From Swiss-Prot:
Signal peptide coordinates: 1-23
Species the sequence originates in: Brevibacillus brevis (strain 47 / JCM 6285 / NBRC 100599)
Taxonomy of the source species: Bacteria, Bacillati, Bacillota, Bacilli, Bacillales
Positions of the SLH domain: 26-89, 90-153, 154-203
Subunit structure comment from the entry: The middle cell wall layer is composed of subunits of the middle cell wall protein. These proteins form a hexagonal array with a lattice constant of 14.5 nM in the middle cell wall layers.
Family matches, as Pfam families: SLH
Top-level taxon: Bacteria
Protein's UniProt name: Middle cell wall protein
Amino acid sequence: MKKVVNSVLASALALTVAPMAFAAEEAATTTAPKMDADMEKTVKRLEALGLVAGYGNGEYGVDKTITRAEFATLVVRARGLEQGAKLAQFSNTYTDVKSTDWFAGFVNVASGEEIVKGFPDKSFKPQNQVTYAEAVTMIVRALGYEPSVKGVWPNSMISKASELNIARSITTPNNAATRGDIFKMLDNALRVDLMEQVEFGTDIRHEITKETLLTKYLKVTVRDMEWAQEAGNDSEDLPLVTNVPAIGLGKIKANEVTLNGKDAGIGNTTYKVADGINANDFDGQHVQVWIKDDKEDVIVWMEGSTDQEVIMDRVGEFTLKGKTFEDPKDLSNSDLADLKLELDASEKSYRFNKNTKVTYNFTRFNDPVDGLKEIIKDNADGGFTFGAKVVLDNNNEIAYIHVIDDQSMNKEDEGVKYGSEVISKIDTDKKKITNRDNDKFNDLDGKEEGKDFLVFLNGKPAKFSDLKEGMVYSVYYADGDEDKLLVFATDTVVEGKVDKVVSRNNNDYRLTIGDKTYRVYEGATFSDDGNKDVQDIDKDHWDLVDSLDDETVKLYLDASGRVRHIETKDAIDDRKQKAIVTRSATFNTSKDTWDFRVLTQKGKEITVSLEAKNIYDFDGKNFSRDNKNQDDLEDILVPSKDKDTLLLEVTLDADGKPGKVEFLKPVKVEQESGKAWDDLADEDDDMVGDYEVTDKTAVFNMTGKLEESSKRKELKNAKTAKFKDVADENDLSVIYTVNDKDEVEAIFVVEGDGLTGDAHYGQVIDFGRKGGKDTIRVWEKDGDKVVEKEYKLDGDQDDLKDEDIRRNDFIAFTVDSNDEVVVDDVVEVVNKNAKGMLAEVTDEKGMKDANIDKMVVGLVSDVSKDTITYKDADDNKKKASIKSATVYFDLYDDFGEADGVNEGDYVVMIDSGDISGTKYDYVLIVSDAKTVRKDKLEDDAEAFLKQEPSEKPDPDTKWDALPSKVEGKFTSAGPVKLYRATVELNSKVKAEDVDAIEFYFNGKKVEPSLLNFKDGVITIGYNTEDKVTSSKIKVTNKNGKDSDEATVTFVEA
């Protein structure tokens, strides 16, 4: 029996000469095929024989049932009687089969041949579903075996079908048969020897012949294992595959194969292969084939000889006369009998001989020594283990070997190999590929697919249009011909958290994700900013891989299963962010951490709580060693508006929490003010003097008040800004730092007015997610039009939904330097989903936050070119000035842009502080008088008109003084446990507002052994022998009415 050995280290050649990702099962889940591999082979084989057809869309309905008419058609075709069916179209055999029915001729012929039989009422019931019992009965009759069947139907027919290997284990004979099962039974029947009547008259006799449906009726030449045995030959006499498209492109077509079969009676012939057969799978092997005799002979089935051993593995070690052989320059033909190859995974060795055929990277070598010299040299020089397909002869020696360099990267050797590379962009029209490193592969331009080049995806024939961004690809050359190219791509991607990083040597790092380990070699690439910058991993950059422990990554694997490209889940500007200190550091005695607040370049204010060992100075030394005094941090980590303003780099861990802080040392620090700054800053060319402003430059608006009254300094209202806004002002005082690339590292705006940043206004369409970020789509003003735009959020869309922001609400928002909506700054200007009124407008605080100068509500009574006359709640008429650039939003009917307003519309009119002039910029239509009458919304309309923006306290708003959850630590001293917890007041709560602090342990109020309240930080301790089940800290406001609680969970220190 043939053995096919697939090494786990092989290139997943899987009976193919095409390299493909062996680790495909380790990739992200993909859609399963609708047919398994065996079923697909069966269907394609039957289709090539003209017996079955699909629905024209790649579907064959293998899980559907089949009618009696359809099944009769199949059997008639299998008997080669299709032409007779055309002549029998107008016979009247059954009462319910009309001559106009497409199946009439097939049913009539099947009946005439006694393959099918009707019912006592002379009907055929063509639309009835065929049962398993009926199906095997018709097939047994078609094969001529009905005279040999004895017993009661249907068991007798089922037994005969099992005996003939047509169908086994039919347990539900009266159930409707599926098309897939019918196809399998018919396929099994094709090779069954036919039974025919050989004597007639009174002495009727039947005999089993040497003919089959294939050979007698379908005109198919069969050369398979049975043929070899019956003809007195052996498997060596089966045809040998001597040329396939991946090697002989140009000499044979993409759908052809050349066979050498003198003993098989087919000579050296090139055949067309049916759809679904990948001839490249069988190069160098003896094969079994069915060849349909037609105008153009077509191979409808092909499989390897079951007596030939084919091994899929990787090249290990070459030995010559028992010694390791790595210098092949003196190798000669006389050495072949003593040359052995040990395969990498199986560790078995096989000997070459003078008849061994050698192919290397799809190039055939007439002299095997020439090919082996190249293979041995390249394999040794690169430290690779190339993929190999090995075919053994009857003496267990290598008859054929195809070695593929599926591991080298960035190779550009025309006629040999290009790649591997990672696809960044595909131009299907020009057949051009842009790589992740921005290099381009243009050699396919002007070439004809299928004639001048072939494409394979995961080892199977594909189209150039199937190639996508993120795939790893290499290009080889058919038989070394520079004009005949082979593009091999894989789409194996592994995503998950790195559990472990292991280094075997300076050129072998391994990443463990789940229960799988993946190897990274020098030459692979890395990106942690969404592939804006792609870094080669070389001897100077292994730290990029070494630092991936506990990170979520995407690994793009090459054909051998090695890592070709690494992407972190989050971009570097999400994980490593420049920041400024906004609240001074203080030492937390209960956690041994330094706690302070920062504002990141993304506009997020974050509380940092880190041990000294995770805080690094300008020289990369942490404050827990290297003679560093961590007490200095109290004087260093403070907010400032001077030239000594500290720029930090905060690294977030996989959970988005600060895990490391580094001080960024500037090369230069400069300061300019007023007109001098305005002249220096060029927003058009993105320059500050001679220094370039890049997309990585951090811009901070630090014009808020620096409070120094308490021990902990705090910078109020710190925000981020855009360079174009900062560069366009002439009343600012600005500090900027420069790095060693003459780029502006950071800009600190420390004094000045008018830098609030323009507010955006828009009508909410929906929320979504793209590129790993939550998004919001809005209709917003663009000049005098309303356009649809999608923004990424800098936070969670659920935070907006929690504020009851929904579709059709009108909001004000700002975007940060990355054009992401700052979630914390979103203001719901008009709540269209409010209960009890047509729409609810924001209060004075909301107007201030949204930078709205004026906002009114009203019922439109008249409209002129530049004036809207409206009525208020008291039916007083008022006028509102509008302009040509005023835009109109429909918040209740058609949504989005409105053409204007009409008498009877209920409106909200807004004058934005960001747009010059006092005329109204936005008119929002929330309903109309007709709708109010129809839906009986008079009360809602009255409530709407009574609104006047004012500061209104929310009676349901609770005093939010503490975080909801706090983690404390406990230690044991004999039977006594010492519980300690620290909690910081929320940023908007002042320490002087707190009147009382209480501690509850296991549901009871207790007196803490330690209670310290300083600079807004509460430290509390309690000693007891009891085990904690629940605990909380409660604070009460000085008004005596408001209180807040924090649940404390204790973990062992």
